C-alpha cells in the first residue's frame, strides 16, 4: 500500500501529523524504533522496524508527530509527483512561484532547501537537494520541517 501513498503537509497514507507514537505505529502496523534527540526527551525521531517504509523517519515533538522525512529513493511521492531523486528543476516546475529557496547549511551550491508552505511556518513540504541538484530528503509536516539538525 505504501507505493500508492502521497507525502503531504498533512501526513503520509494513514499517518497524520499530530498523531501519537502509538497511533502512528498502529496505522502502519509496524513497531517504531529510535531515540530522543534532546536531553529532555521532548523531541524523538523514530523509524519503522521494517517493511516498505525504509528510509522514512518520524519526528515527534512533545509526544505528537510533527514531521515525516523520506531519505531514500522509493515509491513514495508528493501529490505533484516529486520523490527522492527528482531534480531541483522538477521541484520548481511542480511547485512554481510559491516555492522558497535558501542555500543548504552544510553543502555548497547548487545544494539548497526548497520549501513549499501550505500555511507559512505551520504546514509545508521541504525538499533538501544535494550538490548534484537532486532531492536527497523530503520533509513534510509542521514548522519543524525547517529544523536542520534533528530538533535544532
Task: Set out the residue ranges of the language-model regions.
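Short, low-complexity, Pro/Ser/Thr/Gly-rich segments in the mature regions of secreted, periplasmic
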Residues: 139-152
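Surface-exposed aromatic
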Residues: 7, 72-77, 108-117
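N-terminal low-complexity, Pro/Thr/Ser-rich intrinsically disordered segments
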Residues: 1-14
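Mid-length scaffold segments of soluble, non-membrane domains
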Residues: 68-71, 81-84
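N-terminal post-signal-peptidase region of extra-cytosolic proteins
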Residues: 8-10, 39-46, 73-78
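Extracytoplasmic/periplasmic, Sec-exported soluble proteins
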Residues: 12-16, 79-83, 119
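A cross-family detector of function-defining hotspots
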Residues: 20-62, 83-142
Amino acid at each position: 500500500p505504501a507505493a500508492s501513498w502521497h507525502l503531504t503537509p498533512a501526513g503520509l497514507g494513514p499517518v497524520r501529523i499530530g498523531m501519537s507514537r502509538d497511533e502512528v505505529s498502529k496505522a502502519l502496523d509496524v513497531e517504531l524504533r529510535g531515540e530522543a534527540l534532546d536531553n529532555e526527551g521532548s523531541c524523538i525521531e523514530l523509524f519503522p522496524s521494517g517493511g516498505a517504509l525504509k528510509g522514512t523517519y518520524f519526528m515527534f515533538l512533545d509526544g505528537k508527530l510533527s514531521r515525516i522525512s523520506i531519505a531514500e529513493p522509493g515509491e513514495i511521492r508528493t501529490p505533484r509527483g516529486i520523490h527522492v531523486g527528482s531534480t531541483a528543476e522538477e521541484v520548481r516546475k511542480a511547485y512554481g512561484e510559491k516555492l522558497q529557496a535558501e542555500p543548504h547549511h552544510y553543502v555548497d551550491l547548487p545544494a539548497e532547501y526548497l520549501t513549499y508552505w501550505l500555511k507559512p511556518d505551520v504546514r509545508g513540504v521541504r525538499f533538501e537537494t544535494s550538490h548534484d541538484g537532486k532531492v536527497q530528503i523530503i520533509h513534510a509536516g509542521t514548522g519543524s520541517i525547517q529544523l536542520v539538525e534533528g530538533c535544532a
